[in-house]
From Swiss-Prot:
Keyword rRNA-binding appears in the UniProt entry: no
Location (main, coarse): endoplasmic reticulum
BP-aspect Gene Ontology terms: response to stress
Gene name of the record: DER2.2
Keyword Membrane: yes
Keyword vocabulary terms for this entry: Endoplasmic reticulum, Membrane, Transmembrane, Transmembrane helix
Transmembrane stretches, start-end: 22-42, 97-117, 122-142, 153-173
Organism name: Arabidopsis thaliana (Mouse-ear cress)
Entry protein name: Derlin-2.2
Length: 244
């Protein structure tokens, strides 16, 4: 069993493995009181006035307490981050990392700006960790890039992947969780998808270009993909619970 887990971990692409590792270490460290969540959460005042810039990163690494909800989010992170990196961004590690950085920047900007809007500031002030929203962004992007894959939700009903974000959003509302986390992820995901996929087809211009320093860190690799015998190879059955 341990060997199988080790093999599964080693076979993960580098960005997925790095993010999953950092998230698990951070969350476990907080659960064991080795790390304090108060040193990790997003606080604009502390970032600007006390130069605690690490909070812009660490708030994406903490998935709250170690419970069943944490396990589900780790599953979502490992699954959809891996699917994107191995398929849509296969051989383009720098582009994938740039997508995550773009999403993190959009999410942070929304929370910071929302915190300055009357009547909305109180709601945005409660959003101090954006890890779940970034995970949801990956789910959204994957669903837009694979809209025709058939999925099943808890064996209750089937749908195509294009509706996956809405199914998860509906489930969050059904169990009484805040919809803000999912909505923010959908906004960030749609912003990326529009600028990276839709807008270039409309104007023949690409506003999102991966910076050269990221390209230098992760050079593009040539990809040779054998045609699968079953066209539904990438459509692993979806039988998951989503909670926030």
């Amino acid at each position: 069993m341990a060997q199988a887990v080790e093999e599964w971990y080693k076979q993960m692409p580098i960005i997925t493995r790095s993010y999953l590792t950092a998230a698990v270490i951070t969350t476990v460290g907080c659960s064991l009181d080795i790390i304090s969540p108060y040193n990790l959460y997003l606080n604009p005042t502390l970032v600007v006035k006390q130069y605690q810039y690490w909070r812009l990163v660490t708030n994406f690494l903490y998935f709250r307490k170690m419970d069943l909800d944490f396990m589900f989010h780790m599953f979502f992170l490992a699954r959809y981050c891996k699917l994107l990196e191995e398929n849509s961004f296969r051989g383009k590690t720098a582009d994938f990392l740039y997508m995550l950085l773009f999403g993190a920047s959009v999410l942070t900007g929304i929370v910071l700006i929302g915190g300055m809007i009357p009547y909305l500031s109180a709601s945005f002030a409660k959003i101090i960790f954006l890890s779940n929203s970034l995970t949801f962004m990956m789910v959204y992007v994957w669903s837009k890039q694979n809209p025709y894959i058939h999925m099943s939700f808890l064996g209750l009903f089937t749908f195509t992947a294009a509706y996956l974000p809405w199914v998860l959003l509906g489930f969050s509302i059904l169990v009484g969780a805040s919809a803000w986390v999912d909505l923010l992820g959908m906004i960030a995901g749609h912003a990326y998808y529009f600028l990276a996929e839709v807008y270039p087809r409309m104007t023949n211009r690409r506003p999102l270009k991966t910076p050269s320093f990221l390209k230098a860190l992760f050079a593009d690799e040539p990809v040779v993909v054998a045609r699968p015998e079953d066209v539904r190879f990438a459509a692993a059955p979806f039988d998951e619970i989503h909670q926030d």
